[in-house]
Amino acid sequence: MPENTVIRVEDLSFAYGNIPVLEDVSFSIKREDFVCIVGPNGGGKTTLLRLILGLLQPDRGSIRVLSQPPEAARRRVGYMPQRAELDSQFPMRACDVVLMGRLRNTKLGPFRRADRNTVAAALDEVGMADLAKRSFSALSGGQRQRVLIARALACEPEILLLDEPTANLDPLVQDEMNDLLNRLNERLTVILVSHDVGFVAQYVKTVVCVNRTVAVHTAESVTGDSIRELYGHDVRLVQHRHSH
């Protein structure tokens, strides 16, 4: 695999039972790319992320992540799922949530000072250092998303995978989140799933269109025709940048 390629997918197919989800998928992602995965509901976007993480195994074809099988590279990938399996009412501080991201990097026993230093740095990077001791349940939706991104950063990844990180956020908060992801992309490969088609050309470099098969475009080349072909109908391309 070329040195600047961090993910390579070749001739991949996957089905849940007899229901095909992905067929004959081949593409690659370069280091420090900013990638948005788009497509209709049920098109295979989240399944593709799970295959990249090694949580699912392809029926045919291969995936290499950082020149390794996905399950071997998982420690080098930070992941924020679409729905965090956290009870927002559980009495846990923001820093405790982020500390969970150190579990796979830490031997059995109490967390070390180095772990807590890494957590503090991750919270600072996402702009949440001042709220580190605040209860997770007391945070706003956007603040919780930042904490969950910090949790993904706490494992010191080379690739950041995010499933719908701006879902259900107000437009201004979405803009702030997108600016954060842009800054993270200065040192990390960032791959996210988004239903916000207007987000695509505004922030990202590469668009991976998923609807059973996969087509890869530069962000500048995404047009109404390509999106219509992907979704099967017209989709409004709305920009969310606001002035305040």
Tell where the protein language model's regions lie, with residue ranges.
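Helix-to-loop junction immediately C-terminal to a conserved catalytic motif
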Residues: 53
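Conserved ABC transporter NBD signature motif
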Residues: 61-75
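Conserved ABC ATPase "signature" region
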Residues: 99, 113-131
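Conserved ABC ATPase signature
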Residues: 135-139, 143
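Catalytic Walker B motif of ABC-type/P-loop ATPase nucleotide-binding domains
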Residues: 160-164
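Helical segment within the ABC ATPase nucleotide-binding domain
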Residues: 174-186
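Conserved beta-strand-loop-alpha-helix hinge in the C-terminal portion
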Residues: 210-237
